[in-house]
């Protein structure tokens, strides 16, 4: 008898506890904090509805499609232990709701509208299960871990980097000089800071030229392949691509992008160009803490990390566990595995809500960066293992004798840790001793150890598992 107008509870349509999830569904785990008086089933169903086919009232055009085929479903709700009135709502989305190969569209659907929803006090997307059918529509990282090692001819150890400081204010020539000294001293990479784009004191083209000169000179002197992450991030996609093309013409191995401020569409565009043209792509996560730091609202970084692997990047900053920036060990290692490994089992103790199969999509190297120095080297080597990039900005440039000795100190410390580990020593217990022994052979390392012997950044992590 026609359609029934009016408002009805979301849970009547979108809460389906008997639903068996399909292998092709995108699964989401939301941390839901309902407004007082809103039952969790209604809150979970509201999230499923508003992030898929639903709207606030019944509409007659519902009759022109098959809601059962296209609607999101809240299929399970569980209370969060130790939190009052907070729940994990599991939502399944049919694959047809999403455009192939578009992280942009995936996020617009899943987190686009629902976070401002009145029935919720707060909402956080904790994890996503990306089905293999959807993974296969993405190129993913331009090259991945193995191809990067082959390009650089560097095996069996973490890679070493350094962010050039002061991040703003240097002229292009002085900037290039700092790059040369770091690379000559033994680092594999130097890095543009995330906010170095093309400012009045240093235009991008000048920086690219001087940095290329620096890395070729350092390569000739050391016999090692060197790189500098040239930041191609720009105000328009066209300008970004112009910078990437110039980097390729210079013959440098790697460019860089700020993927959250630049946006997923720009990032995926750049990643495709990088694969087609043999450039590695370093990703900085500037702005991530705005989205991921609050425990009960936003998007957890593990979701942003998965999204980056799909969109494309060969390196991404992933916290340090030991430095000045946020990151708890188990949670950090959880998303480090999601970045690097091909198959990751569900493991709630590390914050992993779903088993994820990447079906041979290349992996991403996690970058540890922020407030770290030579005394942290044993812990970093143990925590992150070989497939990582360890980046020391102040920990290189703050060396009392200058940049090149700072780079020497870091390289000696790293080689000492890798050697000790390969000999079967326990880096966690004997770390300080290993560094002290290496100081005997390296005055540069001894000087670095003097400067930073007491520094620790110790505050409790804001975002913990409980």
Swiss-Prot record:
GO terms for molecular function: magnesium ion binding; monooxygenase activity; ribulose-bisphosphate carboxylase activity. CDD domains: RuBisCO_large_I (cd08212). It is an enzyme of class 4 (lyase). Keywords: Calvin cycle, Carbon dioxide fixation, Chloroplast, Disulfide bond, Lyase, Magnesium, Metal-binding, Methylation, Monooxygenase, Oxidoreductase, Photorespiration, Photosynthesis, Plastid. Substrate binds at residues 113, 163, 167, 285, 317, 369. Binds 1 Mg(2+) ion per subunit. Its EC number is 4.1.1.39. One of its GO terms (biological process) is photorespiration. Heterohexadecamer of 8 large chains and 8 small chains; disulfide-linked. The disulfide link is formed within the large subunit homodimers. This is Ribulose bisphosphate carboxylase large chain. It comes from Drimys winteri (Winter's bark). The gene is rbcL.
């Amino acid at each position: 008898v026609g359609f029934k107008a009016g408002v009805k509870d979301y849970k009547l349509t979108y809460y389906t506890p008997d639903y068996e999830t399909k292998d092709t569904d995108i699964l989401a785990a939301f941390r839901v904090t309902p407004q007082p008086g809103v039952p969790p089933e209604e809150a979970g169903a509201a999230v499923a509805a508003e992030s898929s086919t639903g709207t606030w009232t019944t509409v007659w055009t519902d009759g022109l499609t098959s809601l059962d085929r296209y609607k999101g479903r809240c299929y399970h709700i569980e209370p969060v232990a130790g939190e009052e009135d907070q729940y994990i709502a599991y939502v399944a989305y049919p694959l047809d709701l999403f455009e192939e190969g578009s992280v942009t569209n995936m996020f617009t659907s899943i987190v686009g509208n629902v976070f401002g929803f009145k029935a919720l006090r707060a909402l956080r997307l904790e994890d996503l299960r990306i089905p293999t059918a959807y993974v296969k529509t993405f190129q993913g990282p331009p090259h991945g871990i193995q191809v990067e090692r082959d390009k650089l001819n560097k095996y069996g150890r973490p890679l070493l980097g350094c962010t050039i400081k002061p991040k703003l204010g240097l002229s292009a020539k002085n900037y290039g000089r700092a790059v040369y000294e770091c690379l000559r001293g033994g680092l594999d990479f130097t890095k543009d800071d995330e906010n170095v784009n093309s400012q009045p004191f240093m235009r991008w083209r000048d920086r690219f030229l001087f940095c290329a000169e620096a890395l070729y000179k350092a390569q000739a002197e050391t016999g090692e392949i060197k790189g500098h992450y040239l930041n191609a991030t720009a105000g328009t996609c066209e300008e970004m691509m112009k910078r990437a093309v110039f980097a390729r013409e210079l013959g440098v191995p790697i460019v860089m992008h700020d993927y959250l401020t630049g946006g997923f569409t720009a990032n995926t565009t750049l990643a495709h160009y990088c694969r087609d043209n043999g450039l590695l792509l370093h990703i900085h996560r500037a702005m991530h803490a705005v989205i991921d730091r609050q425990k009960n609202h936003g998007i957890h970084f593990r979701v942003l990390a998965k999204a980056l692997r799909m969109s494309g990047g060969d390196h991404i900053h992933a916290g340090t566990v030991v430095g000045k920036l946020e990151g708890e060990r188990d949670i950090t290692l959880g998303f480090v595995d999601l970045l690097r490994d091909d198959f990751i089992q569900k493991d709630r103790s590390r914050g992993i809500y779903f088993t994820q199969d990447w079906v041979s999509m290349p992996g991403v190297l996690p970058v540890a960066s922020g407030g770290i120095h030579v005394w942290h080297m044993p812990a970093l080597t143990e925590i992150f293992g070989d497939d990582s990039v360890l980046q020391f900005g102040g920990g290189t440039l703050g060396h009392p004798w200058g940049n090149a000795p700072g780079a020497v100190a870091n390289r000696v410390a790293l080689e000492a840790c890798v050697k000790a580990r390969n000999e079967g020593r326990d880096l966690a217990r004997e770390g300080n001793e290993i560094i002290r022994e290496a100081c005997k052979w390296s005055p540069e390392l001894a000087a670095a150890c003097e400067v930073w012997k007491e520094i620790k950044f110790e505050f409790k992590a804001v975002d913990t598992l409980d």
